[in-house]
Amino acid sequence: AATESAVVTIGALQAGTKDNVIPDDALLRINVRTFDTAVRTRVLDAITRIVKAEADASGAPTPPTITTTEHYPLLRNDPSWSARLAGAIRKQLGDDRVHELAAPISASEDFGSFGTEWGVPSVFWYVGGTDPDLYRTAEQAGRVAQDVPTNHNPRFAPVIHPTLETGVQAMIAAVLDALESGLR
């Protein structure tokens, strides 16, 4: 269904070392992001099916080796803790500095492991760190998505100050709120 999105990124393709020698093998590094485990399974199965079919169609002498190197649980924020901590962070930083996302982002992130492994609620948030002039210019041009580099982009370069201070203030607000609540 159209609501079951998936992102498949080919992060690296490595084959051979010389322009005039046909390599024996190739390495394809793929990242898959989904919001649903059933969708994730279908996507991974499709990748396996396609890779095996392409190897077979090309007459490869051996079947491809497919290895999962990293696999993390889906990152799902606990709704009640998200609302609670957003309130605590707003109180600390001000309403104008806390923005809730309208829709989930398919981040490639291992943070989901913490709540899943320990069986506790977890909340993941972003701290904006873009140079204010760069952001303002991109926003005025209606090009934030195109011109503002995000995590994992080679041009991503957060401004250290006040980003670090803001992140620490947000974390302190969240921790104090959680401790004051008795972690209920």
What name fits each language-model region?
Residues 1-184:
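Metal-dependent amide/peptide-bond hydrolase catalytic core
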